[in-house]
Amino acid sequence: MTATLERRANATVWGRFCSWITSTENRLYIGWFGVLMIPTLLTATSVFIVAFIAAPPVDIDGIREPVSGSLMYGNNIISGAVIPTSNAIGLHFYPIWEAASLDEWLYNGGPYQLIVCHFFIGICSYMGREWELSFRLGMRPWIAVAYSAPVAAATAVFLIYPIGQGSFSDGMPLGISGTFNFMIVFQAEHNILMHPFHMLGVAGVFGGSLFSAMHGSLVTSSLIRETTENESANAGYKFGQEEETYNIVAAHGYFGRLIFQYASFNNSRSLHFFLAIWPVMGIWFTALGISTMAFNLNGFNFNQSVVDSNGRVINTWADIVNRANLGMEVMHERNAHNFPLDLASVEAPSINA
């Protein structure tokens, strides 16, 4: 009898815990994905803050030339970063217990791998939590689908690209200047500006910004006035009201006259689907482009593609970009090798031509 009562009590405690985890009445919804998200994101955030402030220099290239990234070692907010895991580690799983000492783990950039792995699990759990809350509330799942775009982008630069290049040292540093360094080196080695998927991503991000600004300004400009001219238009609305607060017909008519009739939407669902899908698909394509370039399927190369009847090269903008790429690649990892592969693998041009 006592054992039965204990089992019932335990089941009741577990049941109460499950109800609390999955309750939509909480101020912040937790959910089962939240059980995984909270500790992983807290770990990633805590280690990032400590490493950004106090981590010692990291031997990023694996050649015994440590690079400083933390504030306490001479950097500021702009130049500081969490330096990627050493090239000597490559793609090996490198938790603290795999190192001979904490100093060795820090020297080889262990915090970067710890942050990236926990961050990846955390953002995937956040996406699952969005779906879970939508499911509990009887909503459709498209919020999580939209969030999959930044998740795909982060996965591409922090995981897929290092895997394709063979080392976590090729991942994006966790800092402002480190991000720009990653972008410059990526252009030098992969010619990303000439990759169609990157072009689609640019169109998605800038187009999404434009459409968002246009939509917000049109809605704000076509509010249905519920007050007199002596009162604020905002006074006529209350949070959660069922009635629409703006006149889509008026907005459609304005925009149709501003450009042409079929340039605007007269259906609210079609409009908002377009506003969502445009930037999401753009970022999806960018993430896919990064993932293909990770395995050296690079952007288009039109170098020296225009020649005259005598075979002499007529330089185009592609040749200027190529020269800039070589210059950036020469500056990258200048102590790790004498020449970038592009320069070392071709014959020197004749000076008599």
From Swiss-Prot:
Tyr-161 forms a radical intermediate that is referred to as redox-active TyrZ, YZ or Y-Z. C-terminally processed by CTPA; processing is essential to allow assembly of the oxygen-evolving complex and thus photosynthetic growth. One of its GO terms (molecular function) is electron transporter, transferring electrons within the cyclic electron transport pathway of photosynthesis activity. The chain crosses the membrane at residues 29-46, 118-133, 142-156, 197-218, 274-288. The D1/D2 heterodimer binds P680, chlorophylls that are the primary electron donor of PSII, and subsequent electron acceptors. It shares a non-heme iron and each subunit binds pheophytin, quinone, additional chlorophylls, carotenoids and lipids. D1 provides most of the ligands for the Mn4-Ca-O5 cluster of the oxygen-evolving complex (OEC). There is also a Cl(-1) ion associated with D1 and D2, which is required for oxygen evolution. The PSII complex binds additional chlorophylls, carotenoids and specific lipids. A quinone binds at H215, S264, F265. The keyword Chloroplast applies. Pfam families: Photo_RC. Fe cation binds at H215, H272. GO terms for cellular component: chloroplast thylakoid membrane; photosystem II. Pheophytin a binds at Y126. PSII is composed of 1 copy each of membrane proteins PsbA, PsbB, PsbC, PsbD, PsbE, PsbF, PsbH, PsbI, PsbJ, PsbK, PsbL, PsbM, PsbT, PsbX, PsbY, PsbZ, Psb30/Ycf12, at least 3 peripheral proteins of the oxygen-evolving complex and a large number of cofactors. It forms dimeric complexes. 2 of the reaction center chlorophylls (ChlD1 and ChlD2) are entirely coordinated by water. Photosystem II (PSII) is a light-driven water:plastoquinone oxidoreductase that uses light energy to abstract electrons from H(2)O, generating O(2) and a proton gradient subsequently used for ATP formation. It consists of a core antenna complex that captures photons, and an electron transfer chain that converts photonic excitation into a charge separation. The D1/D2 (PsbA/PsbD) reaction center heterodimer binds P680, the primary electron donor of PSII as well as several subsequent electron acceptors. This is Photosystem II protein D1. The gene is psbA1.
